[in-house]
A protein has these predicted regions:
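Conserved glycine-rich Rossmann-like NAD(P)H-binding loop of the short-chain dehydrogenase/reductase
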Residues: 24-38
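Residue(s) in the substrate-gating loop at a strand-loop-helix junction
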Residues: 136
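Active-site loop-to-helix junction immediately N-terminal to the catalytic Tyr of the SDR YXXXK motif
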Residues: 90, 95, 141-150, 162, ...
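Alpha-helical segment proximal to the catalytic Tyr-Lys
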Residues: 120, 165-169
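Active-site helix of classical SDR
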Residues: 115, 152, 160
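Substrate-binding pocket helix/loop in short-chain dehydrogenase/reductase
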Residues: 91-92, 96-104, 196, 200
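Conserved glycine-rich cofactor-binding loop
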Residues: 3, 10-12
Length: 204
């Protein structure tokens, strides 16, 4: 009977996490920049409900209303998965302010303000809650040619620890997952680069 809010669940990891939560018995609130048609189909096929909300999370003003809508629909929320993210690739010497801001606004700024809004609901509900943030192995390794992505995912690790420290007294668990390279839309350009793809595969 739990309700999980999952951002960026149209494809890839986010879609997989939404389906996994649905298989575990959760109803899903999906927040995406496009309608996640295939995810909705698969979640509802499992007998779970799916509330689809469309938003550009780089604009944080609308975040409280999104979670208010989720609570209005289901009566409560229990889990937040902050998965929505993007990546821009360019040498650090040539990296633009727009590519910096777009990535930072979605990958770290929205993570904090989504978590803040969810935590307020968790506290008001009195039952605690779970927040799962998606970091990256680049939070630790740095990587190359993705300066704003690396900065944002390093920030995700930092604020995850901070929120866990502050909100433990409210029975809110805050954790981060740091995946390696996965076959998703975000890594399509990387996998298409034969040299970089070979370098990564050689590590296995």
């Amino acid at each position: 009977g739990k309700v999980a809010v999952v951002t960026g669940c149209d494809t890839g990891l986010g879609q997989g996490m939404a389906l996994g939560l649905a298989q575990a018995g959760c109803d899903i609130v999906g927040i995406n920049i496009v309608e996640p048609t295939e995810t909705i189909k698969q979640v509802t096929a499992l007998g779970r409900r799916f509330l689809s909300l469309t938003a550009d999370l780089r604009k944080i003003d609308g975040i409280p209303a999104l979670l208010d809508r989720a609570v209005a629909e289901f009566g409560h929320i229990d889990i937040l998965v902050n998965n929505a993210g993007l990546i821009r690739r360019e040498d650090a010497l040539e990296f633009s302010e727009k590519d910096w801001d777009d990535v930072m606004n979605l990958n770290i700024k929205s993570v904090f303000f989504m978590s803040q809004a969810a935590a307020k609901h968790f506290i008001a509900q009195g039952n605690g809650g779970k927040i799962i943030n998606i970091a990256s192995m680049l939070s630790f390794q740095g990587g190359i040619r993705v300066p704003s992505y690396t900065a944002s995912k390093s920030g995700v690790m930092g604020v995850t620890r901070l929120m866990a420290n502050e909100w433990a007294k409210h029975n809110i668990n805050v954790n981060a997952i740091a995946p390696g390279y996965m076959a998703t839309n975000n890594t399509q350009q990387l996998r298409a680069d034969e040299q970089r793809s070979a370098e990564l595969l050689d590590r296995i």
